[in-house]
């Protein structure tokens, strides 16, 4: 049995168990219920093919979702991440898979045209941003468009939900919401990474 004694021993036990479980699944046809991410890996993901949202145990705890944090921080971090992932269901990629997981463009030509009209300015706006690690380089707004849409939409959805839940939130709590969101994706890029 696993215990606190040996990390290597615990990894071997877990790996053996995982292999045994994989062998049992062969031929059972339950692949649609699988998600190949370990619970200890912080991940929140929308499965486009099966129209479902997954959250691992690791993402359901601090720093993303901390029950000791104020509601503003929970909405700003976890709520915005959920909104980000759900946006993928109806975004530029999501319109090629319907609610039953069938491939096909379910948008009308008018919807597709309106989407392009509404997302064009967002692409242009992001193209004007420079990388902090390499100010001479600009973001490729067309290349990052899907993620930018999901980020902006996720924050808007979480903000609307927070305002509905806490209509009289203080200025400090409103700021806490946005600080929590900015903390979710914080990272420092080297000039080499920024140029990739």
Language-model-derived ranges and their functions:
Residues 1-196:
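Intrinsically disordered, low-complexity linker/terminal regions across diverse proteins
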């Amino acid at each position: 049995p696993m215990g606190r004694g040996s990390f290597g021993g615990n990894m071997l036990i877990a790996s053996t168990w995982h292999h045994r479980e994989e062998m049992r699944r062969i031929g059972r046809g339950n692949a649609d219920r699988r998600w190949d991410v370990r619970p200890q890996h912080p991940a929140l993901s929308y499965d486009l093919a099966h129209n479902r949202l997954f959250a691992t145990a690791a993402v359901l705890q601090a720093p993303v979702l901390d029950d000791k944090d104020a509601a503003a921080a929970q909405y700003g971090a976890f709520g915005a991440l959920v909104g980000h992932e759900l946006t993928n269901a109806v975004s530029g990629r999501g319109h090629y898979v319907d609610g039953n997981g069938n491939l096909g463009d379910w948008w009308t030509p008018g919807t597709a045209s309106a989407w392009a009209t509404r997302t064009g300015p967002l692409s242009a706006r992001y193209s004007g941003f420079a990388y902090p690690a390499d100010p001479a380089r600009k973001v490729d707004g067309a290349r990052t468009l899907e993620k930018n849409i999901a980020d902006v939409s996720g924050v808007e959805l979480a903000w609307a939900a927070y305002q509905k839940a806490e209509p009289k939130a203080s200025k400090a709590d409103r700021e806490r919401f946005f600080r929590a969101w900015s903390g979710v994706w914080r990272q420092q890029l080297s000039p080499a990474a920024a140029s990739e």
